[in-house]
A protein has these predicted regions:
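Anion (oxyanion) recognition and catalysis
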Residues: 2, 6, 105
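Histidine-acidic metal/acid-base catalytic patches
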Residues: 24-151
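Residue-level signal for beta-strand positions within conserved beta-sheet cores that form or flank
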Residues: 8-10, 111
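Aromatic-lined carbohydrate-recognition surfaces of secreted/lumenal glycan-active proteins
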Residues: 10-23, 46
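Hydrophobic, well-ordered secondary-structure segments
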Residues: 1-2, 11
Length: 151
């Protein structure tokens, strides 16, 4: 990855994923692994729906990544199954979305936060409401983190 980044001048941010299960076993769907934290990637994308599906500790992950965090996919998940990546609106699952957003803002994160919520089952009005709710959630918690930031 480092060579590709250097040669292209692009930032390649590898995303955290989750283990795939088949029957009682797991399938190695991602190489070298679904968890980018111990890998030597310079830049990582963190998806909170994926931390739910993987049953990973999102706050431990963001602390471990530190300055390697380059991009965020903001969503939530229940973590009730490792078979379904839910992409719930933030605040509707079991992930610490509020704490996560406040932490990255307070820490000086300068990358993008992209909403990645599932709206396929919604009509236009429902979709707009879910997106507005998610955007307000993100803005509120990023602002709270910024307010605590040391000048």
């Amino acid at each position: 990855m480092a060579t590709r980044e250097h040669d292209s001048g692009l930032c390649v941010a590898v995303e955290n994923m989750f283990p795939w299960t088949a029957g009682r076993g797991t399938v190695q769907a991602y190489l070298p692994h679904w968890d980018p934290v111990p890998q030597p990637y310079d830049h990582v994308t963190m998806d909170l729906s994926h931390t739910a599906t993987a049953r990973s500790d999102a706050m431990a992950m963001v602390h471990a990544l530190g300055d390697r965090l380059a991009h965020v996919h903001l969503a939530d998940g229940s973590g009730s199954t490792t078979l379904k990546d839910e992409h719930l609106p933030p605040g509707r699952g079991n992930q610490p979305c509020a704490e996560f957003l406040e932490h990255i803002a307070e820490s000086g994160y300068t990358g993008a936060v992209a909403l990645e919520v599932g709206t396929r089952r919604q009509d236009r009005t429902g979709r707009e409401a879910v997106l507005a709710e998610s955007l307000a959630f993100a803005r509120d918690h990023l602002a709270a983190g910024l307010a605590r930031r040391e000048p």
